[in-house]
């Protein structure tokens, strides 16, 4: 029965082959598989970490964007407020200038009125004296007549 001896030899060869594989081939394969498993786990961990960082960056970006928008709105509001203040100041200044010009105009009108009144009084006095002189056909004392006419005009 060569078949048994051959089978026995094959079994011993198989056991030796398995032992050699376990001793020299299997440990490097297990090591490679463990390293690959560790790399995959590390890659998954890094992917999760990157996803978390991305979410955090999005949240920070949204917060920064919201803050920037609020600051921009505050600057716009401040600009509008300053504009309103400047317009109010310009209106006040224009009103003051208008009041000054009106006051100067009134003063000038009053001055002109007084001047014209005085000129009219003087001219009226001259005309009255001249008329009176022609009526009585003689030349009266002009200073006495002028005083008399001025007193008469002032009583009016």
From Swiss-Prot:
InterPro entries to which the protein is assigned, alphabetical: ATP_synth_B-like_membr_sf, ATP_synth_b/b'su_bac/chlpt, ATP_synth_F0_bsu_bac, ATP_synthase_B_chain
Gene3D superfamilies cross-referenced by the UniProt entry: F1F0 ATP synthase subunit B, membrane domain (1.20.5.620)
Signal peptide (UniProt feature, chain positions): none
Compartment list: Cell inner membrane
Pfam family, one: ATP-synt_B
Residues passing through the membrane, by range: 6-26
Sorted UniProt keywords: ATP synthesis, Cell inner membrane, Cell membrane, CF(0), Hydrogen ion transport, Ion transport, Membrane, Transmembrane, Transmembrane helix, Transport
GO molecular function terms noted in the UniProt entry: proton-transporting ATP synthase activity, rotational mechanism; proton-transporting ATPase activity, rotational mechanism
Similarity-based family: Belongs to the ATPase B chain family.
Protein name per UniProt: ATP synthase subunit b 2
